[in-house]
C-alpha cells in the first residue's frame, strides 16, 4: 500500500467515513489525526449503520490497529459511549489505541462553548456546542488536561482543583452562569480514566514502529479543507487542521512519511453552520438535494445547506493538500435532474476571479459563474463500472476531473461498500508525476486532458 492521508475537499461531510472504510481493508493501521466529537462518520456495512465520532472507521476490521492520535481532543463520555455501542453490535475494540498526549474535553468546555456562541449573537459561528474550540484554546494556552493526566489520580485531582475554579470565574463574571462544583467532575473523570486506561499508549512511538516495519498506514481527517483553522473560511472554521499537513503534526510523523493524499468531495456541495457559501441553493433544487442526500449532520442533526459543485474551492483543496486523486461521493443524489451546474469561477465587483479569496468579506460577495451540463434521468445506484453510467453522468465526472486538474479514482453511488466504482486503485495507481509526463497527457478516462 503506502502511507495515505484521506482529507475532505469541501466543508466536511463529504463521505470520508465510507472512503476510509473501503481503503482500510488494505491498511495495517488507521489513524484519526485531528478534531473531536464535532465530526461524525457514517459507515454502512451489510445494511448495518455505524455512526462514529472519535473512533477511526477502520475499527470495523478486527485486524487493523486504530489510533486516536495526539491532534484530536477527546470527550471521554462520548468515546466510552461509542465503545459501548460497538460492543453491543458485536464489534471488538481490542485494536483501539488512544494517544496519551491527546487533550481532553471537560464539562466547562461545553458550557463555555454554548455560552460564547450565544454571546456572539448575530456574529455566531455555528459551532456544534461540544466544547471543541475551548478545548483547543486551553491546549494553546498550555492549561489543558491531557489523557496522560487522567492516568494519575493525584495529578488529575490537582490539575482540576486549579482549573475548575479558574473557569468558574469566567462562567460567573463573563457569562453570568452558575459555577461548577469541582468534586463531581473530578470523581467522574477518575472513573472515565479507569475505563480508558487499557487503550492509552504512546501513539507517536507506535506509528514510528509501524513506519519502520513498512506497514500500510491510513490517516483519516475530520471536517474538510475549507474548515481548516489557517486555510479555511476564517472565522467560520474549526479549531484544528483537517488538511493533509495536519496529519504530520496531529499524528506525530514527518512529512516524508506520507506517500499519497486522497481528497473526498461530494458531487455537489454542502455546508453546516454559518459562513459564506457562493453556490448555495435556497430554492426547490437545494431542497431536493437536501432530501435526496439525507443532508443532516451525524453529530448535531442540523440540516446542511446545499448547493452546486464549487470548482473554485475544489481547485484550492487540490493545491493546499497536494491531492493525488479524488473520490467523488453521492453522485446518485443528482439522478433525475434536468441539468446540473458547476461553478468554474467567481464574479467579484464586476471581474472574474478563479482563485479562492482568503478574505471572508470578499468571499461573501463572490457570485458563482456557472457552466451548465445536461443531467440524467436514470438511476446510477446500481452502476458498478464507468461503462454502466449514463453518458451524461460519465461526462459530468470527466468535466470535474478536467476542472480540478486531478484524476478521479473512486465514485460512490450510495452509502454501502458495494455501491462504489473503483476507477483506478487510489493506493497503487500512478502518482501525479506519472500522470502528466508530458504536460497534461491523458492516461485514463477520468483523468484531466
Curated annotation (Swiss-Prot):
GO CC annotation terms, alphabetical: cytoplasm
Residues annotated for GTP binding in this entry: 12-18, 40-42, 304, 330-332, 412-414
Top enzyme class: ligase
GO molecular function: adenylosuccinate synthase activity; GTP binding; magnesium ion binding
Chain residues that bind Mg(2+): 13, 40
Any one Gene Ontology BP term: IMP metabolic process
Residues the record marks as active site: 13, 41
Reaction equation(s) it catalyzes: IMP + L-aspartate + GTP = N(6)-(1,2-dicarboxyethyl)-AMP + GDP + phosphate + 2 H(+)
Enzyme Commission code: 6.3.4.4
HAMAP family the record matches: Adenylosucc_synth
Family designation: Belongs to the adenylosuccinate synthetase family.
The protein, known as: Adenylosuccinate synthetase
Organism of derivation: Synechococcus sp. (strain JA-3-3Ab)
Taxonomic lineage from the root: Bacteria, Bacillati, Cyanobacteriota, Cyanophyceae, Synechococcales
Amino acid at each position: 500500500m503506502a502511507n495515505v492521508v484521506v482529507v475532505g475537499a469541501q466543508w466536511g461531510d463529504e463521505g470520508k467515513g465510507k472512503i476510509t472504510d473501503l481503503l482500510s481493508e488494505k491498511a495495517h493501521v488507521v489513524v484519526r489525526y485531528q478534531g473531536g466529537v464535532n465530526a461524525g462518520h457514517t459507515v454502512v456495512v451489510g445494511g448495518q449503520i455505524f455512526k462514529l465520532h472519535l473512533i477511526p472507521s477502520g475499527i470495523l476490521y478486527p485486524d487493523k490497529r486504530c489510533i486516536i492520535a495526539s491532534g484530536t481532543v477527546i470527550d471521554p463520555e462520548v468515546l466510552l459511549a461509542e465503545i459501548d455501542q460497538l460492543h453491543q453490535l458485536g464489534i471488538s475494540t481490542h485494536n483501539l489505541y488512544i494517544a496519551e498526549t491527546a487533550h481532553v474535553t471537560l464539562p466547562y468546555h461545553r458550557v463555555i462553548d454554548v455560552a460564547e456562541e450565544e454571546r456572539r449573537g448575530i456574529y455566531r459561528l455555528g459551532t456544534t456546542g461540544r466544547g471543541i474550540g475551548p478545548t483547543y484554546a486551553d491546549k494553546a494556552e498550555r492549561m489543558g488536561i491531557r489523557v496522560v493526566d487522567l492516568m494519575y489520580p493525584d495529578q488529575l485531582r490537582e490539575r482540576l482543583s486549579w482549573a475548575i475554579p479558574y473557569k468558574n470565574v469566567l462562567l460567573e463574571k463573563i457569562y453570568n452562569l452558575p459555577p461548577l462544583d469541582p468534586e463531581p467532575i473530578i470523581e467522574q473523570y477518575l472513573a472515565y480514566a479507569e475505563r480508558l486506561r487499557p487503550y492509552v499508549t504512546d501513539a507517536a512511538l507506535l506509528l514510528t514502529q509501524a513506519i519502520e516495519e513498512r506497514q500500510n498506514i491510513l490517516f483519516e481527517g475530520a471536517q474538510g479543507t475549507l474548515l481548516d483553522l489557517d486555510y479555511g473560511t476564517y472565522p467560520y472554521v474549526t479549531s484544528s487542521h483537517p488538511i493533509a499537513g495536519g496529519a504530520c503534526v496531529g499524528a506525530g510523523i514527518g512529512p516524508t512519511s506520507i506517500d499519497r493524499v486522497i481528497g473526498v468531495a461530494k458531487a455537489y456541495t454542502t455546508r453546516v453552520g454559518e459562513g459564506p457559501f457562493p453556490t448555495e441553493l435556497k430554492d426547490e433544487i437545494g431542497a431536493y438535494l437536501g432530501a435526496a442526500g439525507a443532508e443532516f449532520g451525524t453529530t448535531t442533526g442540523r440540516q446542511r445547506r446545499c448547493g452546486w459543485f464549487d470548482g473554485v474551492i475544489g481547485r484550492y483543496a487540490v493545491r493546499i493538500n497536494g491531492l493525488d486523486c479524488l473520490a467523488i461521493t453521492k453522485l446518485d443524489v443528482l439522478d433525475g435532474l434536468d441539468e446540473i451546474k458547476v461553478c468554474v469561477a467567481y464574479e467579484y465587483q464586476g471581474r472574474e476571479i478563479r482563485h479562492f479569496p482568503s478574505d471572508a468579506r470578499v468571499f461573501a460577495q463572490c457570485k458563482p459563474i456557472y457552466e451548465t451540463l445536461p443531467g440524467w434521468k436514470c438511476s446510477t445506484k446500481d452502476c458498478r463500472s464507468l461503462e454502466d453510467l449514463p453518458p451524461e453522468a460519465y461526462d459530468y465526472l470527466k468535466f470535474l476531473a478536467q476542472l480540478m486538474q486531478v484524476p478521479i479514482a473512486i465514485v460512490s453511488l450510495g452509502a454501502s461498500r458495494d455501491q462504489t466504482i473503483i476507477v483506478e486503485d487510489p493506493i497503487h495507481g500512478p502518482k501525479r508525476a506519472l500522470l502528466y509526463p508530458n504536460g497534461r497527457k491523458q492516461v485514463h478516462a477520468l483523468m484531466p486532458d
